[in-house]
Amino acid sequence: MNSITIDNVCIRWLGHAGFFLGWQDIKIYIDPFQINKEPSFDNKADILLITHDHFDHCSPEDIQKVQRSDSTTLIPESCSLEFRGYTRRVVEGDILAEGFEIKGVRIEVLPSYNLNKPYHPRGFGVGYVVELGEIRIYHAGDCDFFPEMKSIRADVSLLPIGGTYTMDEEEAASAVAVISPKVAIPMHYGKLEGTNGNPEKFKTFVQGKNPDIKVIILDS
Protein backbone atom coordinates (compact mmCIF):
# COMPACT_ATOMS: atom_id res chain seq x y z
CA MET A 1 0.00 0.00 0.00
CA ASN A 2 1.19 3.52 -0.70
CA SER A 3 -1.18 5.38 1.63
CA ILE A 4 -2.94 5.22 4.98
CA THR A 5 -5.81 7.20 6.46
CA ILE A 6 -5.64 8.32 10.08
CA ASP A 7 -8.56 10.28 11.56
CA ASN A 8 -9.76 11.28 8.07
CA VAL A 9 -6.28 12.42 6.99
CA CYS A 10 -4.84 10.62 3.96
CA ILE A 11 -1.06 10.22 4.02
CA ARG A 12 0.42 9.01 0.74
CA TRP A 13 4.11 8.39 0.13
CA LEU A 14 5.23 9.69 -3.26
CA GLY A 15 8.66 8.10 -2.97
CA HIS A 16 11.92 9.40 -1.49
CA ALA A 17 10.94 12.30 0.84
CA GLY A 18 7.76 13.21 -1.04
CA PHE A 19 4.32 13.01 0.57
CA PHE A 20 0.75 13.95 -0.20
CA LEU A 21 -1.58 14.88 2.66
CA GLY A 22 -5.31 15.08 2.05
CA TRP A 23 -7.82 16.38 4.60
CA GLN A 24 -11.35 17.54 3.82
CA ASP A 25 -10.84 19.56 0.62
CA ILE A 26 -7.21 20.51 1.39
CA LYS A 27 -4.38 18.98 -0.66
CA ILE A 28 -0.80 19.34 0.59
CA TYR A 29 2.40 18.19 -1.11
CA ILE A 30 5.77 17.95 0.61
CA ASP A 31 9.04 17.68 -1.38
CA PRO A 32 7.55 16.08 -4.53
CA PHE A 33 10.23 14.30 -6.58
CA GLN A 34 10.11 12.08 -9.68
CA ILE A 35 6.32 12.06 -9.83
CA ASN A 36 5.31 9.73 -12.64
CA LYS A 37 1.86 11.10 -13.36
CA GLU A 38 0.64 14.67 -13.09
CA PRO A 39 -2.36 14.78 -10.73
CA SER A 40 -5.74 16.03 -11.88
CA PHE A 41 -6.50 19.70 -11.24
CA ASP A 42 -8.67 18.83 -8.25
CA ASN A 43 -5.79 16.91 -6.68
CA LYS A 44 -3.15 19.59 -7.18
CA ALA A 45 -1.67 21.48 -4.27
CA ASP A 46 -3.46 23.98 -2.13
CA ILE A 47 -0.26 24.07 -0.10
CA LEU A 48 3.24 23.01 -1.13
CA LEU A 49 5.99 22.59 1.47
CA ILE A 50 9.66 22.47 0.47
CA THR A 51 12.23 21.52 3.12
CA HIS A 52 15.41 22.65 1.29
CA ASP A 53 16.74 23.32 -2.18
CA HIS A 54 18.59 20.09 -2.98
CA PHE A 55 17.42 18.67 -6.30
CA ASP A 56 15.66 15.68 -4.74
CA HIS A 57 13.52 17.92 -2.50
CA CYS A 58 13.06 21.06 -4.56
CA SER A 59 12.48 19.78 -8.10
CA PRO A 60 11.06 22.50 -10.38
CA GLU A 61 9.80 19.86 -12.83
CA ASP A 62 7.80 18.06 -10.15
CA ILE A 63 6.66 21.23 -8.44
CA GLN A 64 5.21 22.39 -11.75
CA LYS A 65 3.24 19.14 -11.99
CA VAL A 66 1.48 19.58 -8.64
CA GLN A 67 1.11 23.38 -8.45
CA ARG A 68 -1.91 25.47 -9.34
CA SER A 69 -1.85 29.20 -9.98
CA ASP A 70 -3.35 29.77 -6.54
CA SER A 71 -1.13 27.35 -4.61
CA THR A 72 0.69 28.60 -1.53
CA THR A 73 4.32 27.47 -1.36
CA LEU A 74 6.51 27.57 1.74
CA ILE A 75 10.26 27.46 1.17
CA PRO A 76 13.23 28.11 3.47
CA GLU A 77 15.00 31.43 3.14
CA SER A 78 18.06 29.67 1.73
CA CYS A 79 16.10 28.65 -1.38
CA SER A 80 16.39 31.18 -4.20
CA LEU A 81 13.73 29.78 -6.53
CA GLU A 82 10.38 31.43 -7.22
CA PHE A 83 7.16 29.59 -8.01
CA ARG A 84 3.67 30.23 -9.29
CA GLY A 85 1.07 31.42 -6.84
CA TYR A 86 2.04 32.83 -3.46
CA THR A 87 5.50 31.97 -2.14
CA ARG A 88 6.35 32.54 1.50
CA ARG A 89 9.90 32.21 2.81
CA VAL A 90 10.13 30.66 6.25
CA VAL A 91 12.72 30.03 8.96
CA GLU A 92 12.71 27.65 11.89
CA GLY A 93 10.48 28.91 14.66
CA ASP A 94 7.81 30.33 12.37
CA ILE A 95 4.28 29.30 13.31
CA LEU A 96 1.55 29.91 10.76
CA ALA A 97 -1.45 30.10 13.07
CA GLU A 98 -3.74 32.50 14.92
CA GLY A 99 -4.86 34.44 11.89
CA PHE A 100 -1.83 33.55 9.79
CA GLU A 101 -2.93 30.02 8.96
CA ILE A 102 -2.81 28.91 5.35
CA LYS A 103 -6.31 27.95 4.23
CA GLY A 104 -7.19 26.96 7.77
CA VAL A 105 -4.13 24.73 8.23
CA ARG A 106 -1.74 25.40 11.10
CA ILE A 107 1.91 24.84 10.15
CA GLU A 108 4.96 24.98 12.41
CA VAL A 109 8.43 25.42 10.92
CA LEU A 110 11.14 23.46 12.70
CA PRO A 111 14.92 23.10 12.48
CA SER A 112 16.36 20.37 10.26
CA TYR A 113 20.11 19.84 10.13
CA ASN A 114 23.07 17.47 10.32
CA LEU A 115 25.20 17.15 13.43
CA ASN A 116 28.21 15.28 12.04
CA LYS A 117 27.85 15.70 8.29
CA PRO A 118 28.43 18.71 6.01
CA TYR A 119 25.38 18.30 3.77
CA HIS A 120 22.68 20.14 5.72
CA PRO A 121 24.04 22.84 8.04
CA ARG A 122 21.65 24.50 10.44
CA GLY A 123 19.62 27.21 8.72
CA PHE A 124 19.87 25.56 5.30
CA GLY A 125 16.62 23.61 5.53
CA VAL A 126 13.56 23.18 7.69
CA GLY A 127 11.11 20.56 8.89
CA TYR A 128 7.37 21.03 9.23
CA VAL A 129 4.58 20.04 11.59
CA VAL A 130 1.23 20.18 9.80
CA GLU A 131 -1.89 20.19 11.94
CA LEU A 132 -4.95 18.76 10.19
CA GLY A 133 -7.96 18.48 12.45
CA GLU A 134 -6.74 16.60 15.51
CA ILE A 135 -3.67 15.12 13.81
CA ARG A 136 -0.16 16.58 13.91
CA ILE A 137 2.13 15.28 11.16
CA TYR A 138 5.89 15.91 11.37
CA HIS A 139 8.07 15.85 8.24
CA ALA A 140 11.70 15.99 9.35
CA GLY A 141 13.37 16.96 6.07
CA ASP A 142 17.00 15.84 5.68
CA CYS A 143 18.57 15.70 9.12
CA ASP A 144 20.26 13.80 11.90
CA PHE A 145 18.80 13.13 15.34
CA PHE A 146 19.19 16.64 16.76
CA PRO A 147 18.48 17.82 20.33
CA GLU A 148 15.39 19.91 19.53
CA MET A 149 13.49 16.78 18.53
CA LYS A 150 12.84 16.20 22.22
CA SER A 151 10.32 19.06 22.19
CA ILE A 152 8.47 18.05 19.00
CA ARG A 153 4.84 16.98 19.44
CA ALA A 154 3.50 14.81 16.66
CA ASP A 155 1.02 12.00 16.14
CA VAL A 156 2.71 10.87 12.93
CA SER A 157 6.44 11.23 12.22
CA LEU A 158 7.94 11.01 8.72
CA LEU A 159 11.67 10.43 9.18
CA PRO A 160 14.64 9.80 6.85
CA ILE A 161 16.51 6.52 7.34
CA GLY A 162 18.88 6.51 4.35
CA GLY A 163 22.14 7.17 6.14
CA THR A 164 25.02 8.98 4.39
CA TYR A 165 23.17 12.32 4.12
CA THR A 166 20.71 11.80 6.97
CA MET A 167 20.02 9.58 9.96
CA ASP A 168 20.36 5.86 9.50
CA GLU A 169 17.79 3.34 10.75
CA GLU A 170 19.03 3.22 14.35
CA GLU A 171 19.40 6.99 14.70
CA ALA A 172 15.93 7.51 13.26
CA ALA A 173 14.54 4.99 15.74
CA SER A 174 16.14 6.99 18.57
CA ALA A 175 14.43 10.10 17.21
CA VAL A 176 11.10 8.27 17.15
CA ALA A 177 11.61 7.19 20.75
CA VAL A 178 11.94 10.78 22.00
CA ILE A 179 9.18 12.22 19.79
CA SER A 180 6.91 9.33 20.75
CA PRO A 181 4.34 9.56 17.94
CA LYS A 182 1.54 7.07 17.51
CA VAL A 183 2.81 6.24 14.01
CA ALA A 184 6.26 6.42 12.40
CA ILE A 185 6.77 6.22 8.64
CA PRO A 186 10.28 5.88 7.16
CA MET A 187 11.31 7.86 4.09
CA HIS A 188 14.37 8.95 2.08
CA TYR A 189 15.57 5.48 1.20
CA GLY A 190 15.83 3.20 -1.81
CA LYS A 191 15.72 5.72 -4.67
CA LEU A 192 19.13 7.40 -4.91
CA GLU A 193 22.74 6.48 -4.24
CA GLY A 194 23.54 6.95 -0.55
CA THR A 195 19.98 6.22 0.60
CA ASN A 196 20.31 2.54 1.33
CA GLY A 197 18.31 2.39 4.55
CA ASN A 198 16.26 -0.71 5.30
CA PRO A 199 12.74 0.06 6.55
CA GLU A 200 12.36 -3.35 8.21
CA LYS A 201 15.54 -2.72 10.16
CA PHE A 202 14.15 0.66 11.22
CA LYS A 203 10.94 -1.03 12.34
CA THR A 204 12.88 -3.53 14.45
CA PHE A 205 14.85 -0.75 16.15
CA VAL A 206 11.68 1.22 16.91
CA GLN A 207 9.91 -1.81 18.34
CA GLY A 208 12.92 -2.48 20.54
CA LYS A 209 12.74 1.03 21.97
CA ASN A 210 8.96 1.43 22.23
CA PRO A 211 6.68 -1.38 21.03
CA ASP A 212 3.63 0.88 21.40
CA ILE A 213 4.71 2.99 18.42
CA LYS A 214 3.33 1.64 15.16
CA VAL A 215 5.72 1.63 12.20
CA ILE A 216 4.04 1.71 8.80
CA ILE A 217 6.13 0.98 5.72
CA LEU A 218 4.51 2.44 2.62
CA ASP A 219 5.11 1.60 -1.03
CA SER A 220 5.80 4.47 -3.40
Model-assigned labels for residue ranges:
Residues 27-28, 47, 156, 183:
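Short, Asp-centered acidic motifs that coordinate Mg2+ and/or phosphate
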Residues 74, 144-220:
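Cap/insert and terminal regions of metallo-dependent hydrolase folds
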Residues 21, 31, 52, 59, ...:
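Divalent metal-coordination and catalytic microenvironments
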Residues 53, 111, 162:
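Short glycine-/small-residue-rich Rossmann-like dinucleotide-binding loops
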Residues 34-81, 153-158:
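Active-site metal-binding motif and surrounding structural segment of the metallo-beta-lactamase
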Residues 61-66, 82-86, 148-151, 171-175:
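A short acidic, amphipathic alpha-helical/loop segment
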Residues 79-84, 193-196:
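Short, charged/polar "capping" segments at the starts of alpha-helices
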Residues 1-43, 91-152, 167, 219-220:
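Core dinuclear metal-dependent hydrolase active-site scaffold
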